[in-house]
């Protein structure tokens, strides 16, 4: 049995979508228990494998992260993180304030001893539908080559255990594929990656080929990773908007759009990385999953499933054994 702590109050459409996702999760997974933290006046579920705990406070999206974690001791997010810290829950999921959740992860759940800096990882879509693991996407704006090496090791374990890839290919994001390309950070990281035998390093990868599906794990610093992630999100939205405007521009195009609706829906699904669940803060002494703030019930459900798999695969212990002291 896996037990997941869930923040009922975090996210743009909470608690509605959270309750819907939790209900579906316990119905689909008979070996899953949920501890749900939130406002009891908004709780409307009844299930033997859902334990509800009332919280008097909520961390808002505009709250300053560290201050919110320190001052709002009875918030749903803080109580959720404490359940992981105490070992009562195997992992946790929230769609709330990203900075606050990262602070809760660092200051409450705590780092694995030996991990210099945790990394935020997402699975992004590829043209072949496989997707790839991408980190760091914003946990740390600055990084040393040694940090990138740890990210590669953590990402490799994540791809193996969460995505089921036996021998993941790991690449370093750079401005060219040649070993000598890049700045001092990427050059030093390349040397460290090449010398390390714990993962399958396949060299540099350029941003233009990220979505081709040729690599399973891509590593970069949090500053670059966050910009790439937001660029991909923005590009996908812009393409969707342009397609819609083109289709609606004439009667002929509207007819074509109706004929192609199923294909367009398939394309949209391929581009939606919420299908893969949330982002995960790797390197902590517990599983912390961040669902997108605008998650619908389906995306939040995927994040719960992601946390469940991490618990089943004992991913935290494997990371301790690999990169911990």
Curated annotation (Swiss-Prot):
InterPro entries: FA_synthesis, Phospholipid_synth_PlsX-like. It comes from the Bacteria. The keyword Lipid metabolism applies. It is found in: Cytoplasm. Pathway: Lipid metabolism; phospholipid metabolism. One of its GO terms (molecular function) is phosphate:acyl-[acyl carrier protein] acyltransferase activity. One of its GO terms (cellular component) is cytoplasm. Keywords: Cytoplasm, Lipid biosynthesis, Lipid metabolism, Phospholipid biosynthesis, Phospholipid metabolism, Transferase. It catalyses: a fatty acyl-[ACP] + phosphate = an acyl phosphate + holo-[ACP]. GO terms for biological process: fatty acid biosynthetic process; phospholipid biosynthetic process. Homodimer. Probably interacts with PlsY. Belongs to the PlsX family. Catalyzes the reversible formation of acyl-phosphate (acyl-PO(4)) from acyl-[acyl-carrier-protein] (acyl-ACP). This enzyme utilizes acyl-ACP as fatty acyl donor, but not acyl-CoA. This is Phosphate acyltransferase. It comes from Staphylococcus epidermidis (strain ATCC 35984 / DSM 28319 / BCRC 17069 / CCUG 31568 / BM 3577 / RP62A). The gene is plsX.
């Amino acid at each position: 049995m896996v037990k997941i702590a869930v923040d009922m109050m975090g996210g743009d459409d909470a608690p509605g979508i959270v309750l819907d996702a939790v209900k579906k999760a316990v119905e689909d997974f008979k070996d899953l228990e949920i501890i749900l933290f939130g406002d009891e006046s908004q709780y409307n579920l009844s299930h033997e494998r859902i334990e509800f705990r009332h919280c008097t406070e909520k961390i808002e999206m505009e709250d300053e992260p560290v201050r919110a974690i320190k001052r709002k001791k009875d918030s749903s997010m803080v109580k959720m993180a404490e359940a992981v810290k105490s070992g009562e829950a195997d992992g946790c999921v929230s769609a709330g304030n990203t900075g606050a959740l990262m602070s809760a992860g660092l200051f409450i759940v705590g780092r694995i001893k030996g991990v210099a800096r945790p990394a935020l990882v997402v699975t992004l879509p590829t043209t072949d539908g496989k997707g790839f693991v991408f980190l760091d996407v914003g946990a740390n704006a600055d990084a040393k080559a040694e940090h990138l090496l740890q990210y590669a090791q953590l990402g490799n374990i994540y791809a193996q255990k969460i995505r089921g890839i036996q021998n993941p290919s790991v690449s370093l994001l750079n401005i060219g594929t040649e070993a000598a390309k890049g700045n001092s950070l990427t050059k030093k990281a390349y040397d460290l990656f090449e010398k390390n035998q714990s993962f399958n390093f396949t060299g540099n990868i350029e941003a233009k080929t990220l979505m081709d599906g040729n690599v399973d794990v891509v590593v970069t610093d949090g500053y670059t990773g966050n910009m790439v992630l937001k660029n991909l999100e923005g590009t996908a939205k812009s393409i969707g908007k342009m397609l819609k405007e083109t289709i609606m521009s004439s009667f002929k195009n509207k007819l074509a759009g109706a004929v192609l609706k199923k294909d367009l829906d398939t394309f949209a699904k391929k581009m939606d990385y919420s299908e893969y669940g949330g982002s995960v803060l790797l390197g902590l002494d517990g599983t912390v999953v961040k669902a997108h703030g605008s998650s619908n019930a389906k995306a939040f459900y995927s994040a719960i499933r992601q946390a469940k798999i991490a618990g089943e695969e004992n991913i935290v212990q494997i990371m301790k054994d690999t990169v911990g002291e």
